[in-house]
Amino acid sequence: MHNYKKISILLILSTLILSACAFPNKEKTENQVPAKDQLSMVQTAVDEYKKASGGLLPIKDRDDSYSIYLKHPVDFNKLKPKFLSQLPGNSFENGGIYQYVIMDVDKDPKVHLIDLRTSEVLKDIRIRIDASGKPLQLGKKVAPNVYEIEYKKYGFKKQPTVPSPYSNERLPVYMNGGNDFVIDYRLDLAKAIKKEKSLPKPGQDIRYLLYKDSPILPAYSPEFTINSKNEPVFKSKVKKY
């Protein structure tokens, strides 16, 4: 009986140790919250770097295959230590869950965030699809160049979703004809539209509504617009993701 208790205690301790190891630095509270002070700190550093370098920005070079939201990640190596004493706690480079990126690089460079938890979910979905050994099959057409995933063929119990960075919603994951994942932000866009006093025009890309009051960008999203009923819809011609 004494030995049984010792074994039980050892098992409990082992479980606790493994649990602690399973949550790296990115699980710390300061590494998860898109804190305004951290964002402001990086924005100030970017502005100072731009001024000191004659208009250049501290960004990593990426080609046109990347979407506008993922194309210009902040290069912290260019900011430390002269313009930034320490990396923000919630940055990917410091074990956090956010990728710092810059938007509107030509006119008014602003620092924003990409929630990398979304990327992790998409990576897991890709691994499961590839591991199935079955050729990719697109399901029901949702919009031009946007299709459901034939999830049952790849071992999923239901249509894949990702947690929204803007709400408590679960957002559907689809694919385009180029074998890329796209995320359907219409649930969040519908809420954003209701808050607007001046509605956008049909045909206008309305994704900006999502980061109008949030530092987080809608990564992996096709373009969305508004229809005659003021509902968010996929744009008829999808080009960049």
Give the role of each language-model region.
Residues 59-121, 132, 140-241:
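Extracellular/periplasmic head regions of type IV pilus-like filament subunits
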Residues 16-20:
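C-terminal motif of bacterial Sec signal peptides marking the signal peptidase cleavage site
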Residues 1-8:
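Bacterial N-terminal signal peptides that target proteins for export
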Residues 36, 50-51, 62, 69:
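Short helix/turn-capping signatures at newly exposed starts of structured segments
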Residues 29-36, 40:
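Juxtamembrane membrane-water interface segments immediately C-terminal to a transmembrane helix
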Residues 38-56:
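N-terminal alpha-helical signal peptides/signal-anchor transmembrane segments
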